[in-house]
Amino acid sequence: MNKRSFLQNAIKSTAILAVITLVAALFAACTEQKIAFISVDITGADYAKDFTASGTMVDHNGQARSVKDFAGKVVVLFFGFTQCPDVCPTSMAELAEAKKILEKNNKGDGDKIQGLFITIDPERDTLPVLKAYMGNFDPTFLAMRTAPDKLVAVAKDFKTYYKKIPGKTDTSYSMDHSAGSFVYDTKGNVRLYTRYGSGADALASDLKLLLK
C-alpha cells in the first residue's frame, strides 16, 4: 500500500469512526432521556387517553371537561374521594407542593401545571363538596365527577380500581381504590403513572422534564 492509499484509508476510517461515535452518543442521549423519569413511563399506552371517552365529565364549576381543554399544560390526574383519610389528601398536597417547587425554581412553570381530581364517590361528592375540597390544596386544581354508571366505564378505560366498602350505615361507607396519578404532557398525551408516596420533589422533577 502506497502512502497516498494509506492516508485515504486512514481518513475514511476516521470518518466512519466519527459517525459511529456520533450515533452512539445520540443513542445514549435518547436512552438517558427515556430513563430519566422517576415515575413509570407509560408513553404510548392504549389506555387512559381521555376521561371523556365513556361519557361527560363535569368539573366542580359545572363545566364539561376533557384533557384537550388543558393543552399547553402538564396535567396530573388522580382518582379519589373527599372522605379519604390519607392517600387522597396526601397525593393532592404533594402535587400542590410540586407545583410550588417548579414555580420557585423557574417563575411561570407553576402556572403550566394542572391538577385534576376525579371522584370515585359521586353519591356523596357533589359539586359544592368537590369545590370546597380542592380549596384545601390549590385554587387552580379542578375536581370532577360523572354519573356512577359512567364512572365504571371511565375507571375501566384507565385500568383503575375502586370498590365501596360497607360501613355501619348506608352513608358511612368507605372506598378502596388505586393510589397513583396519571400525567399528561402539554399535547394531551398520557406519559407517566406516578405511584403514591413518591414525594413532591420526585414529582416536580418529572413534571419539569415534561415542560421542556
Q: Language-model segments: which ranges?
A:
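Short, acidic, Ser/Thr-enriched surface-loop or helix-capping motifs
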Residues: 59-60, 185
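N-terminal targeting signals for export/organelle localization
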Residues: 1-54, 58, 212
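Thiol-/selenol-based redox modules, centered on thioredoxin-like
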Residues: 167-212
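Short active-site neighborhood of thiol/selenol oxidoreductases, capturing the structured segment around
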Residues: 67-91, 95
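Short loop/turn microsegments at loop-to-beta-strand junctions
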Residues: 52-53, 75, 178-180
